[in-house]
Amino acid sequence: MRSKTAANPERLARVLEGLRKYQEAPRAAPPPGAPAIAERMGAALRDYGGDGPDILFVPSLINPPTVLDLGDRSLLRWLAGRGRRVLLLDWGWPGEERHGLSVGGHVEEIMLPLMATLLQPPDLAGYCLGGTMAAAAAQLGGARSLATIAAPWRFHGFPDQERERLAGLWQGSKAVAERLGVLPMEALQVAFWSLDPERTVRKFEEFAGLQGDSAASFVALEDWANDGPPIGHAAARELFEDMFAADLPGSGQWQVGGKIIAPASLPCPLLNIVSTTDRIVPHSSAMTMGERIELARGHVGMVIGSKAQEELWQPLASWLSRVSPS
């Protein structure tokens, strides 16, 4: 932070004021969680209701799933009223039994068994790393359709400098992850803050002047970004070494359940929703196959921003109605 504001003491003061305001902001009670209809290894399949074919949303392992169900900006609750029964895979907290599960292992041991409890294959929608994982689940377990939202696949599409920075962070954290069995959330925060340090400074500078609903929305979003469980050691190793460093998915070498996972092998329609201004998951890292919707919103703003319903929710619902009708 100081390196970004060293030449501007007034800016530093605004940023610090924004941080203080965020820390002292009142928090509303979170909405009640949707009921769990199946559980496995600490993860739960949650039912948000709605009539029609099942659509299962798969969030990232890295942050809580609440970004998909954030107050009056809830994609899940909105879609439940539009001809779909909406389900969420809530990863929960990784207990010791999950410390040895790779990213692909979470697909094999958790996603596929939970999907098997449904009466028929669902539509799948995956956000961020959840989209990468949903692609494996769609190929191995079957799906009516697959929509990915800001999901990385071609990890060589991340700038070289960022991949090198993440490799260095993993090297510095690997011993701790091996000893604890998990990579703490704090280490993950450092990794992803480093992808866009200027934004981290700018958002608190701007928050210093926000009031009312805008300020409350900022607090809710930041609480989500700063919350979440650790990630198991094996999943962290695969994420940093096999994905960011070696790009096994993008080079056609990522195996889950002994099978190569490849977009060309998907048994269903595919939609990739990407943002051309996403600094966390650049659009150049997305799959190239399937249909594509491009937005000019941030990694999170595309899902919950003021234009999200118009630019993402409605186009997603329309696509589902076309390729996977009720």
Identify the residue ranges that each predicted region occupies.
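Short beta-strand/loop motif that positions the catalytic acidic residue
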Residues: 266, 272-274, 278
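Short, surface-exposed "cap/lid" segments of acyl-processing enzymes
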Residues: 30-95
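Conserved loop-alpha-helix segment in the C-terminal half of the alpha/beta-hydrolase fold
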Residues: 276-293
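Short beta-strand immediately N-terminal to the catalytic nucleophile in serine-hydrolase-like folds
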Residues: 124-126, 149, 273
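Catalytic histidine-centered segment of alpha/beta-hydrolase-like enzymes
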Residues: 280-283, 297-311
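Alpha/beta-hydrolase-fold enzymes
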Residues: 1, 119, 133-231
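Alpha/beta-hydrolase active-site loop
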Residues: 100-117
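Gly/Ala-rich beta-loop-alpha elbow adjacent to hydrolase catalytic centers
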Residues: 125-134
